[in-house]
Protein backbone atom coordinates (compact mmCIF):
# COMPACT_ATOMS: atom_id res chain seq x y z
CA UNK A 1 0.00 0.00 0.00
CA UNK A 2 1.64 3.33 -0.99
CA UNK A 3 1.92 6.11 1.53
CA UNK A 4 -1.29 8.09 1.87
CA UNK A 5 -3.58 5.05 1.47
CA UNK A 6 -3.96 5.19 -2.33
CA UNK A 7 -4.80 2.29 -4.64
CA UNK A 8 -2.39 -0.66 -4.75
CA UNK A 9 0.39 -0.34 -7.25
CA UNK A 10 -0.03 -2.36 -10.46
CA UNK A 11 2.04 -5.50 -10.35
CA UNK A 12 2.82 -8.29 -12.81
CA UNK A 13 1.06 -10.60 -10.31
CA UNK A 14 -2.06 -8.45 -10.01
CA UNK A 15 -3.96 -9.22 -13.20
CA UNK A 16 -7.01 -7.13 -12.35
CA UNK A 17 -4.93 -3.95 -12.48
CA UNK A 18 -2.49 -4.98 -15.16
CA UNK A 19 -3.83 -5.72 -18.67
CA UNK A 20 -0.37 -6.88 -19.72
CA UNK A 21 -0.50 -9.57 -17.03
CA UNK A 22 -3.88 -10.76 -18.30
CA UNK A 23 -2.51 -10.98 -21.82
CA UNK A 24 0.53 -12.84 -20.51
CA UNK A 25 -1.66 -15.36 -18.71
CA UNK A 26 -3.74 -15.86 -21.86
CA UNK A 27 -0.64 -16.51 -23.95
CA UNK A 28 0.73 -18.90 -21.35
CA UNK A 29 -2.56 -20.83 -21.39
CA UNK A 30 -2.51 -21.07 -25.19
CA UNK A 31 1.13 -22.19 -25.13
CA UNK A 32 0.27 -24.97 -22.70
CA UNK A 33 -2.68 -26.07 -24.84
CA UNK A 34 -0.43 -26.19 -27.90
CA UNK A 35 2.20 -28.18 -26.01
CA UNK A 36 -0.36 -30.73 -24.86
CA UNK A 37 -1.77 -31.03 -28.39
CA UNK A 38 1.74 -31.50 -29.78
CA UNK A 39 2.48 -34.19 -27.21
CA UNK A 40 -0.58 -36.23 -28.11
CA UNK A 41 -0.69 -35.72 -31.88
CA UNK A 42 2.94 -35.10 -32.78
CA UNK A 43 2.26 -31.52 -33.85
CA UNK A 44 -0.44 -29.31 -35.30
CA UNK A 45 -2.12 -30.99 -38.25
CA UNK A 46 -0.28 -34.27 -37.71
CA UNK A 47 -1.91 -37.64 -37.18
CA UNK A 48 -2.05 -38.91 -33.59
CA UNK A 49 1.03 -40.78 -32.44
CA UNK A 50 0.45 -44.49 -32.75
CA UNK A 51 0.96 -46.85 -29.84
CA UNK A 52 0.86 -50.65 -29.83
CA UNK A 53 0.01 -52.62 -26.69
CA UNK A 54 0.66 -56.37 -26.55
CA UNK A 55 -1.26 -58.25 -23.86
CA UNK A 56 -1.64 -61.84 -22.70
CA UNK A 57 -4.07 -64.21 -24.37
CA UNK A 58 -4.41 -65.43 -27.93
CA UNK A 59 -3.24 -62.87 -30.44
CA UNK A 60 -3.28 -62.29 -34.19
CA UNK A 61 -0.73 -63.38 -36.73
CA UNK A 62 1.50 -60.76 -38.31
CA UNK A 63 -0.71 -60.37 -41.38
CA UNK A 64 -3.89 -59.85 -39.35
CA UNK A 65 -2.16 -57.33 -37.10
CA UNK A 66 -0.92 -55.41 -40.11
CA UNK A 67 1.29 -53.07 -38.08
CA UNK A 68 4.82 -52.13 -39.12
CA UNK A 69 7.38 -51.27 -36.47
CA UNK A 70 8.42 -48.11 -38.26
CA UNK A 71 4.83 -46.82 -38.18
CA UNK A 72 4.44 -47.35 -34.42
CA UNK A 73 5.77 -44.54 -32.23
CA UNK A 74 5.82 -46.63 -29.03
CA UNK A 75 5.30 -50.36 -28.40
CA UNK A 76 4.51 -51.65 -24.91
CA UNK A 77 4.14 -55.25 -23.73
CA UNK A 78 1.99 -55.95 -20.68
CA UNK A 79 3.12 -59.06 -18.79
CA UNK A 80 2.57 -62.16 -20.98
CA UNK A 81 2.09 -59.87 -23.96
CA UNK A 82 5.89 -59.82 -24.16
CA UNK A 83 5.89 -63.34 -25.59
CA UNK A 84 3.34 -62.33 -28.25
CA UNK A 85 5.30 -59.21 -29.17
CA UNK A 86 8.52 -61.15 -29.71
CA UNK A 87 6.67 -63.88 -31.59
CA UNK A 88 5.38 -61.25 -34.04
CA UNK A 89 8.82 -59.71 -34.45
CA UNK A 90 8.32 -56.64 -32.25
CA UNK A 91 10.79 -55.75 -29.53
CA UNK A 92 8.74 -53.51 -27.23
CA UNK A 93 10.13 -50.25 -25.94
CA UNK A 94 8.73 -50.99 -22.48
CA UNK A 95 7.50 -54.02 -20.55
CA UNK A 96 4.96 -53.38 -17.79
CA UNK A 97 2.95 -55.40 -15.29
CA UNK A 98 3.28 -57.73 -12.33
CA UNK A 99 4.77 -60.50 -14.52
CA UNK A 100 2.59 -63.16 -12.89
CA UNK A 101 1.45 -64.66 -16.20
CA UNK A 102 4.75 -64.45 -18.11
CA UNK A 103 5.71 -68.12 -18.30
CA UNK A 104 9.26 -67.54 -19.55
CA UNK A 105 10.78 -64.96 -17.22
CA UNK A 106 14.10 -65.21 -19.05
CA UNK A 107 12.56 -63.06 -21.81
CA UNK A 108 12.98 -60.11 -19.46
CA UNK A 109 16.75 -60.57 -19.43
CA UNK A 110 17.10 -58.92 -22.84
CA UNK A 111 15.74 -55.62 -21.49
CA UNK A 112 17.66 -53.17 -19.28
CA UNK A 113 16.00 -52.37 -15.93
CA UNK A 114 14.79 -48.95 -17.05
CA UNK A 115 12.65 -50.59 -19.76
CA UNK A 116 10.84 -52.93 -17.35
CA UNK A 117 8.20 -51.29 -15.15
CA UNK A 118 7.16 -53.77 -12.44
CA UNK A 119 3.95 -53.47 -10.45
CA UNK A 120 2.64 -55.45 -7.46
CA UNK A 121 0.09 -58.22 -8.02
CA UNK A 122 -2.34 -56.56 -5.62
CA UNK A 123 -3.26 -53.37 -7.46
CA UNK A 124 -6.27 -51.40 -8.68
CA UNK A 125 -5.46 -51.70 -12.40
CA UNK A 126 -5.06 -54.68 -14.68
CA UNK A 127 -1.81 -55.00 -16.61
CA UNK A 128 -3.74 -54.02 -19.74
CA UNK A 129 -4.97 -50.83 -18.09
CA UNK A 130 -1.43 -50.03 -16.95
CA UNK A 131 -0.09 -50.53 -20.46
CA UNK A 132 -2.77 -48.28 -21.93
CA UNK A 133 -2.08 -45.60 -19.32
CA UNK A 134 1.68 -45.74 -19.99
CA UNK A 135 1.08 -45.23 -23.71
CA UNK A 136 -1.21 -42.27 -23.02
CA UNK A 137 1.26 -40.70 -20.60
CA UNK A 138 3.93 -40.92 -23.29
CA UNK A 139 1.84 -39.14 -25.90
CA UNK A 140 0.13 -41.89 -27.90
CA UNK A 141 -3.32 -40.83 -29.09
CA UNK A 142 -4.02 -43.80 -31.40
CA UNK A 143 -3.61 -47.13 -29.60
CA UNK A 144 -4.00 -50.68 -30.92
CA UNK A 145 -4.27 -53.60 -28.49
CA UNK A 146 -3.00 -56.98 -29.71
CA UNK A 147 -3.84 -60.20 -27.86
CA UNK A 148 -6.44 -60.98 -25.23
CA UNK A 149 -8.27 -63.70 -27.14
CA UNK A 150 -9.65 -66.80 -25.42
CA UNK A 151 -9.13 -67.22 -21.72
CA UNK A 152 -11.33 -65.75 -19.00
CA UNK A 153 -14.56 -64.06 -19.98
CA UNK A 154 -14.16 -61.36 -17.32
CA UNK A 155 -10.86 -60.32 -18.90
CA UNK A 156 -12.50 -60.14 -22.34
CA UNK A 157 -15.32 -57.98 -21.02
CA UNK A 158 -12.87 -55.74 -19.15
CA UNK A 159 -10.93 -55.08 -22.36
CA UNK A 160 -14.14 -54.38 -24.27
CA UNK A 161 -15.12 -51.91 -21.52
CA UNK A 162 -12.00 -49.86 -22.29
CA UNK A 163 -13.75 -48.61 -25.43
CA UNK A 164 -16.32 -46.86 -23.21
CA UNK A 165 -13.65 -44.67 -21.60
CA UNK A 166 -12.84 -41.06 -22.34
CA UNK A 167 -9.56 -42.00 -24.08
CA UNK A 168 -10.35 -45.40 -25.60
CA UNK A 169 -8.09 -47.53 -27.79
CA UNK A 170 -8.86 -47.37 -31.49
CA UNK A 171 -8.44 -51.06 -32.26
CA UNK A 172 -8.23 -54.48 -30.57
CA UNK A 173 -7.00 -57.54 -32.47
CA UNK A 174 -7.19 -61.10 -31.13
CA UNK A 175 -6.68 -64.47 -32.80
CA UNK A 176 -10.28 -64.42 -34.04
CA UNK A 177 -11.45 -60.81 -34.30
CA UNK A 178 -10.38 -57.36 -35.48
CA UNK A 179 -12.35 -54.82 -33.45
CA UNK A 180 -12.50 -51.15 -34.44
CA UNK A 181 -13.92 -48.06 -32.78
CA UNK A 182 -16.04 -45.97 -35.14
CA UNK A 183 -16.76 -42.44 -33.90
CA UNK A 184 -17.69 -40.59 -37.07
CA UNK A 185 -16.45 -42.36 -40.19
CA UNK A 186 -14.57 -45.54 -41.02
CA UNK A 187 -13.25 -46.66 -44.40
CA UNK A 188 -11.34 -49.77 -45.36
CA UNK A 189 -10.24 -51.42 -48.60
CA UNK A 190 -9.77 -55.15 -49.10
CA UNK A 191 -12.27 -56.71 -46.69
CA UNK A 192 -14.55 -58.10 -49.39
CA UNK A 193 -16.23 -61.31 -48.17
CA UNK A 194 -15.55 -60.59 -44.50
CA UNK A 195 -18.21 -60.94 -41.80
CA UNK A 196 -18.67 -57.78 -39.73
CA UNK A 197 -20.92 -56.99 -36.77
CA UNK A 198 -21.80 -53.66 -35.18
CA UNK A 199 -22.51 -52.88 -31.52
CA UNK A 200 -23.39 -49.48 -30.02
CA UNK A 201 -21.28 -47.86 -27.33
CA UNK A 202 -23.12 -45.80 -24.75
CA UNK A 203 -26.87 -45.32 -24.91
CA UNK A 204 -27.21 -45.52 -28.68
CA UNK A 205 -25.65 -45.00 -32.11
CA UNK A 206 -27.85 -43.35 -34.73
CA UNK A 207 -27.76 -41.48 -38.02
CA UNK A 208 -25.79 -44.28 -39.63
CA UNK A 209 -24.98 -44.78 -43.30
CA UNK A 210 -22.87 -47.36 -45.08
CA UNK A 211 -21.43 -48.37 -48.43
CA UNK A 212 -20.30 -51.83 -49.46
CA UNK A 213 -22.35 -53.89 -46.99
CA UNK A 214 -24.84 -56.60 -47.88
CA UNK A 215 -27.34 -55.09 -45.42
CA UNK A 216 -26.93 -51.29 -45.37
CA UNK A 217 -26.97 -49.44 -42.06
CA UNK A 218 -28.71 -46.41 -43.56
CA UNK A 219 -31.15 -44.83 -41.14
CA UNK A 220 -30.68 -47.43 -38.41
CA UNK A 221 -30.46 -46.67 -34.71
CA UNK A 222 -28.75 -49.21 -32.43
CA UNK A 223 -29.77 -48.71 -28.81
CA UNK A 224 -27.90 -50.21 -25.86
CA UNK A 225 -28.57 -53.94 -25.78
CA UNK A 226 -29.07 -54.25 -29.55
CA UNK A 227 -26.59 -55.06 -32.30
CA UNK A 228 -26.25 -55.79 -35.99
CA UNK A 229 -24.71 -59.25 -36.24
CA UNK A 230 -23.16 -61.09 -39.21
CA UNK A 231 -23.33 -58.44 -41.91
CA UNK A 232 -21.09 -59.02 -44.90
CA UNK A 233 -18.71 -56.83 -46.88
CA UNK A 234 -19.69 -57.04 -50.55
CA UNK A 235 -17.34 -54.51 -52.17
CA UNK A 236 -13.64 -53.80 -52.24
CA UNK A 237 -14.24 -50.52 -50.40
CA UNK A 238 -16.44 -50.38 -47.31
CA UNK A 239 -17.46 -47.16 -45.56
CA UNK A 240 -19.51 -46.57 -42.42
CA UNK A 241 -20.71 -43.25 -40.98
CA UNK A 242 -22.17 -42.61 -37.53
CA UNK A 243 -24.11 -39.40 -36.96
CA UNK A 244 -24.51 -39.63 -33.18
CA UNK A 245 -22.77 -41.92 -30.72
CA UNK A 246 -20.11 -44.56 -31.33
CA UNK A 247 -19.94 -48.07 -32.74
CA UNK A 248 -17.75 -51.08 -32.18
CA UNK A 249 -17.22 -52.98 -35.41
CA UNK A 250 -16.10 -56.60 -35.11
CA UNK A 251 -14.57 -58.30 -38.13
CA UNK A 252 -14.36 -62.08 -37.86
CA UNK A 253 -10.89 -63.47 -38.61
CA UNK A 254 -10.09 -66.96 -39.85
CA UNK A 255 -13.56 -68.48 -39.70
CA UNK A 256 -16.85 -68.58 -41.54
CA UNK A 257 -19.74 -66.69 -39.96
CA UNK A 258 -22.50 -68.75 -38.39
Residue locations for each model-derived region?
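Short phosphate-binding loop-to-helix
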Residues: 116-137
Amino acid sequence: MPAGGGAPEASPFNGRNNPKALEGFRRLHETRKTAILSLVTGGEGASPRRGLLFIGGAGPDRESLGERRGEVWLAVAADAGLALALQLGFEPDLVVGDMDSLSDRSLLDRFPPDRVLRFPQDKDETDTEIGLRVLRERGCGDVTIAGGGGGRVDHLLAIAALFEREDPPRRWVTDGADIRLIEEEFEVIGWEGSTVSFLPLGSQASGMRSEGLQWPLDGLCFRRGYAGISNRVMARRMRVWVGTGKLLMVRTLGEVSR
